[in-house]
Amino acid sequence: MTVTLCSPTEDDWPGMFLLAAASFTDFIGPESATAWRTLVPTDGAVVVRDGAGPGSEVVGMALYMDLRLTVPGEVVLPTAGLSFVAVAPTHRRRGLLRAMCAELHRRIADSGYPVAALHASEGGIYGRFGYGPATTLHELTVDRRFARFHADAPGGGLGGSSVRLVRPTEHRGEFEAIYERWRQQVPGGLLRPQVLWDELLAECKAAPGGDRESFALLHPDGYALYRVDRTDLKLARVSELRAVTADAHCALWRALIGLDSMERISIITHPQDPLPHLLTDTRLARTTWRQDGLWLRIMNVPAALEARGYAHEVGEFSTVLEVSDGGRFALKIGDGRARCTPTDAAAEIEMDRDVLGSLYLGAHRASTLAAANRLRTKDSQLLRRLDAAFASDVPVQTAFEF
């Protein structure tokens, strides 16, 4: 049989859905997957067929969606979001994944996307293709039975609560407006298209033999969606909490801690979530899980580095940056902006493309990556400046998986 890589036709999608069902334990089914297809640009998908002509088997697939990602400086970038990547178990170790990624990266570059992004099913796969983990998922579990808010925590007065308990499907417009405010100011924020709002709210309904009904807590500047765990009836899981002010964040947590029928509240958040410091006993907010979130590949180094903002406090400095398989660039940072141009000058900082992806949003420090020899420079002062320049004054978060 001849293995061929090409764009899928409509006849390929049933085979793609079969491969998805066999590959992804969380496959959402053909109906929902068809809705996600509306986010895929023309020529944004590839398949590998074993055989030629009608009836040939789909043994590999990958696609990208047209997304909008917020980066430091409240800048929103067109972003290619890779997803639906799978290789049949009958065709592993034949280079199919590499071939599909190479072809998609060519198309993404030709379309002018400065960055590509994905959520990795396994942590050891995508670094070789230039992707680096750029956000961190951090689960906190609070024993609410003993939780008390610090006297300094916002909203500690005797006035009425600014939070309402509501049904999610009845307040979509308010959720959308709050989320839109949130995603435009937070590095890692993603525009959520209408089809994904449809899916999110559909998932809030109870499923026979599956998840329980979700409820919502609504504040003028934030919301939280939560449901009781499927098997542990004393655990409430917060599936999404978005707050655009510290007051809203604390008010939502006061309401969650008020779920008296629960023993524990869990949330997948980010490492800089202030929740533990709202409590008199910080140990009650335990870290129960941690993993990489969004991964980034810098497709166009000058365009990406010139697009984001940088810390003003650093002052002006210049260096020469070499990115393996990406080029060598004169980088000048000053007044919160960067100028990046190709150069033949000797490199002062060296790193692989995946390392630049990890640095880009500001969640990971240059000095940490240098300590692991993933970033290399002989100038310690330059490293400190790079550290400070790439830091984000707004904590980096993960919007949603795709």
Swiss-Prot record:
Residue spans crossing the bilayer: none
GO BP annotation list: aminoglycoside antibiotic catabolic process; biological process involved in interaction with host; effector-mediated defense to host-produced reactive oxygen species; response to antibiotic; symbiont-mediated perturbation of host inflammatory response; symbiont-mediated perturbation of host innate immune response; symbiont-mediated perturbation of host programmed cell death; symbiont-mediated suppression of host programmed cell death
Active-site residues, as the UniProt record annotates them: 126, 402
Pfam families given in the database record: Acetyltransf_17, Acetyltransf_9, SCP2_2
Disruption phenotype: No significant difference in terms of intracellular survival in U-397 macrophages and in an in vivo mouse aerosol model of infection. A strain lacking this gene induces more TNF-alpha but less IL-10 production in primary human monocytes than wild-type. Macrophages infected with a M.tuberculosis eis-deletion mutant display markedly increased accumulation of massive autophagic vacuoles and formation of autophagosomes in vitro and in vivo.
Keyword Ubl conjugation carried by entry: no
Residues at which acetyl-CoA binds: 85-87, 93-98, 121-122
Stated consequence of mutating residue 119 to A: Decreases catalytic activity on AG substrates, leads to a change in the number of acetylated sites
EC identifiers of the protein: 2.3.1.-
Annotated phenotype, changing residue 204 to A: No effect on catalytic activity on AG substrates. Prevents artifactual CoA adduct formation during crystallization
GO cellular component, as recorded: bacterial extracellular vesicle; cytosol; host cell cytoplasmic vesicle; host extracellular space
Domain spans labelled N-acetyltransferase: 3-154
Catalytic activity, as annotated: L-lysyl-[protein] + acetyl-CoA = N(6)-acetyl-L-lysyl-[protein] + CoA + H(+)
GO MF, one annotated term: protein-lysine-acetyltransferase activity
Result after altering residue 126 to A: Abolishes catalytic activity on AG substrates. Abolishes catalytic activity on HupB
Subcellular location: Secreted; Host cytoplasmic vesicle, Host phagosome; Extracellular vesicle, Bacterial extracellular vesicle; Host extracellular space
SUPFAM superfamilies (alphabetical): Acyl-CoA N-acyltransferases (Nat) (SSF55729), SCP-like (SSF55718)
UniProt record similarity statement: Belongs to the acetyltransferase Eis family.
Subunit structure, interactors included: Homohexamer; trimer of dimers.
Domain notes: The Eis monomer consists of three regions that are assembled into a heart-shaped molecule. This shape is formed by an unusual fusion of two general control non-derepressible 5 (GCN5)-related N-acetyltransferase (GNAT) regions and a C-terminal region. The N-acetyltransferase domain of Eis is responsible for its modulation of ROS generation and pro-inflammatory responses in macrophages.
Note: Increased expression of eis due to point mutations in the promoter region of eis is responsible for resistance to the second-line injectable drug kanamycin in a number of M.tuberculosis clinical isolates, through acetylation of its amino groups, which leads to inactivation of the drug.
Function: Effector that is released into the host cell and affects host immune responses; it negatively modulates inflammation, macrophage autophagy, and cell death through redox-dependent signaling. Acts as an acetyltransferase. Acetylates 'Lys-55' of dual-specificity protein phosphatase 16 (DUSP16)/mitogen-activated protein kinase phosphatase-7 (MKP-7), a JNK-specific phosphatase; this leads to the inhibition of JNK-dependent autophagy, phagosome maturation, and ROS (reactive oxygen species) generation for enhanced intracellular survival of M.tuberculosis.
Protein known as: N-acetyltransferase Eis
Organism: Mycobacterium tuberculosis (strain ATCC 25618 / H37Rv)
Organism ancestry: Bacteria, Bacillati, Actinomycetota, Actinomycetes, Mycobacteriales
Gene name as annotated: eis
